[in-house]
Amino acid sequence: MQSTSSTSSGSCSRPLEGSTLNSGGSAENVARDGGSGDDSVGIGDENPSGSSAATNGHDSKHNGFIVNNNGSSSRIVDGENNRENTSCSGVQLDKSNQEIIRLIGQYLHDVGLDKSVQTLMLESGCYLEHPSATKFREHVLMGDWSKADSDLKDLEPLIDNGKLATITEMKFILLEQKYLEHLDDGNPLDALHVLRSELTPLQHNITRVHQLSSYMMCSTNQDLYQRAKWEGKGILSRALVMERLQTFMPPSVMMSPRRLRTLLQQAVELQSQHCPCHDMAWETNLETVSLLTDHCCTTDGFPMQTIQILTDHCDEVWFCKFSPDGLKLATGSKDSTVIIWDVDPYKLTLKHRRVLDGQAQLSVSFVSWSPDSKLILVGGTEDSHELYIWNVDDGKLVVKFSQSLEDSLACGAFSRDGARFVCGGQKGQLYLCDLNGTIVDSWEGVRVNSIAFRADNKTILAADNHYRIRGYNFDSPRSDFDILREPHPIMTFSINSADRLALLNVSNQGLHLWDIEDKCLVRRFQGIRQSNFAIHSCFGGVNESFVASGSEDKVVYIWHIKREEPLAKLAGHTKTVNCVSWNPVYPSLLASASDDATVRIWGPKPNGSSATTESDDCSSSSSSSSWNMT
């Protein structure tokens, strides 16, 4: 950015006149100033007093430079070495303080406070960048390519120790802009000269040279802008070129654009990573946070204590699942019943709707909801050969599926489009069926513990007795393939809504998180106790930022998806917690099913109460939670 400004010359009392602006800023800032600014501040300009070249030279040994102050103490501008600088006010500035002042100066200029920058630089005795870098910036923004090339020669010893490849790439960037501007001006012969006599001899990025040559055929300037993806001749495109060139320069010579904002953004992101309750749907940037306090998401609205206990089952409750619309909960029990509960999202309470008890002598081990929340698929243990599909609105049995008395149908799931379901078990059957219960296809010899459809509605994932999760595609051509393998039996698993992560409950190992696209183990969550019984975990919270699982130690565990240590331990059940389900629409609700024949509904604590107090709805039973906020 070209601008007239002032800097110090042996005195703190007045600025120099006729010097050049060094912004160290961004393309946006250059565009804002329009490439000029008579009232701007001069920072890092050449010594205007006519002193020798050595005065404005650089000490290559230290990769910095010393500016003559006409008799005053020298100001050492050295961002790479631990050397002190004496400011005009007599304050000794070490390397760290010099860098902070330079960062502040760059930021102040970016927001347009140029007079403040002038005062800061005069009083501190610091410069934002090397004087040769200032000239280089000025000439690039002016489009004076011959002078910019000369400036680059002066800067060579400071850039990557004068490495030829780096200097060549920088020259290429300059000549590329020069070539495009000639085309924009309607000077194809000048552009051709640059292409043949300046760009081609560099022998750099030949593919790009060929691409540039094709722009000679552009019939209009707009065609050139579109094909080259270029802003056109002017201050904005030159500022973007300057940003590219800055990346090659050490920070002691020229800081990268928006450096302070970059550091602050990194700090905010690091704080969000350390936030135990961080909501990953919340965009972490400088516009959404306060820099005056450390970031920490609150636990308001988080399911942290029992708000209701459902006691309608008369035996162990093995499964619970909220519907996709968040307005219903299905619970399945060893007592052969499935109970449908209505969710009041405003009062955060559940009300008994109906009992589905047509599956006589079937201990209900799993329930799967259709995507429209109207149907449920119900199955039993590995000894069961039947599955049931119920309409939850009218309570009618839609399908009773059974292929053979020898079958084991202990797991099943609807497809993501709700048009089909898949089921299987430990005796080697894997059936793909339509909603009438007609077998569309089957796969023999597949012994599975848990099953799920992927989002493509074609691929079925199944955990088998070889400690694997494999993919099965029934479409032509049929295919099966390994997704992942564990060293111990996979008891159950679930897939997140983004269809990228799998949450596995592994025998004697606990809870593991896998990336099923990259096929790698992401995290081992600590805390739960699990032997050889089926425990069902889930993703949940806003944007599925958390995971939860039951445990044989009677506790519900909650983790942030990026932390191995449990975030919360929800106590209240008196026996093993078999299953947990997080409401997908109302993330303040979490359900847990237990061998103690109850289903607990966990919700936010009332305002003013502690995490260990009980709500009025469950005063007859103990309920508490412990929170790990470290």
Swiss-Prot record:
UniProt keywords, alphabetically: Cytoplasm, Mitochondrion, Phosphoprotein, Repeat, WD repeat
Bias-annotated ranges (Polar residues): 48-57, 66-75
GO cellular component: a single term: cytoplasm
WD repeats: 312-351, 359-400, 404-443, 445-482, 485-524, 529-569, 572-612
CTLH domain: residues covered: 129-190
Gene3D superfamilies for this protein: YVTN repeat-like/Quinoprotein amine dehydrogenase
Modified residues (Phosphoserine): S36, S40
Residue span of region Disordered: 1-90, 604-630
Subcellular localization: Cytoplasm; Mitochondrion
Low complexity bias (residue ranges): 1-13, 609-630
GO biological process, one term: proteasome-mediated ubiquitin-dependent protein catabolic process
Boundaries of every LisH domain copy: 96-128
Physiological role: G-beta-like protein involved in cell signal transduction.
Name of the protein described by the UniProt record: WD repeat-containing protein 26 homolog
